């Protein structure tokens, strides 16, 4: 039976109504999760009207198709990170970005921090296995910053911003980082189910090694094994 039909039967049986546009997104997400090699990859428009990609290997979107790419960057990463408060009192902000992806989190962080404090110095270290060849542009508000980041990969220093991207296996790359204390960690790898190596206890130990004593780790996942590992490492969860 087709995935669409299975979902329709289930929703009808449970008496649940979902708008047709949202239903189409649900079907796409489910298909890409079940059969990533068959569904392939490509640029997708989210419910918020911005764009993201479906990863050809993991079969997952880089951002939530329902919440939207920029909204996810803000609500899951930047806003909960505590950087809004720190940027008003610190002269320098350090960010460890696990999973550069399309570069959206980095662009949002730079834009928002510089809006609040134009004089703030920002250092960002990012890890990524490989950067997609085709990356959709961000909405107008972030487009110039995002374009500049992509054009100058893997590193640049300008206007008080220092950025460095480590390409390759993040488990090896993170060991190369020394003398860095992150005020915020954006842990944005693919799901623990699809990409478990970036959520292991050993990898989380390496992340903790690079965190400031008042640093904040943020992520989209609520995975119980990940939460257990964080507690074991002494993180305070909220």
Language-model features: locations:
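The AdoMet/dcAdoMet-binding core of the Class I SAM-like
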Residues: 2-16, 22, 26, 83-180, ...
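A generic structural signal for short coil/turn motifs at secondary-structure boundaries
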Residues: 61-64, 175, 193-196
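Short alpha-helical
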Residues: 69, 104, 172, 224-225
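Cell-envelope and extracellular/periplasmic
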Residues: 188-190
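C-terminal substrate-binding/active-site "lid" region of AdoMet-derived donor-dependent transferases
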Residues: 195-238
């Amino acid at each position: 039976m087709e995935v669409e039909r299975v979902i329709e039967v289930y929703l009808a049986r449970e008496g649940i109504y979902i708008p047709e546009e949202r239903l189409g997104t649900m079907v796409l997400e489910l298909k890409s999760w079940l059969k990533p090699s068959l569904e392939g990859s490509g640029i997708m428009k989210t419910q918020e009207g911005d764009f993201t990609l479906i990863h050809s290997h993991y079969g997952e979107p880089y951002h939530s198709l329902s919440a939207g790419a920029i909204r996810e960057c803000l609500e899951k990463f930047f806003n909960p990170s505590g950087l809004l408060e720190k940027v008003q009192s610190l002269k320098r902000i350090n960010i460890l970005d696990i999973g550069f992806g399309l570069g959206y989190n980095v662009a949002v962080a730079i834009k928002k921090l510089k809006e609040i404090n134009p004089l703030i110095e920002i250092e960002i270290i990012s890890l990524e296995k490989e950067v997609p060849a085709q990356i959709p542009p961000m909405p107008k508000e972030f487009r110039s910053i995002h374009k500049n980041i992509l054009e100058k990969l893997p590193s640049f220093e300008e206007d008080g911003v220092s950025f460095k991207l480590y390409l390759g296996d993040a488990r090896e790359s993170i060991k190369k980082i020394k003398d860095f204390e992150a005020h915020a960690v954006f842990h944005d790898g693919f799901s623990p189910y699809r990409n478990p190596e970036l959520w292991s206890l050993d990898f989380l130990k390496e992340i903790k090694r690079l965190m400031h004593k008042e640093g904040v780790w943020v992520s989209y996942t609520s995975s119980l094994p990940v939460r257990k590992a964080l507690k074991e490492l002494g993180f305070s969860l909220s």
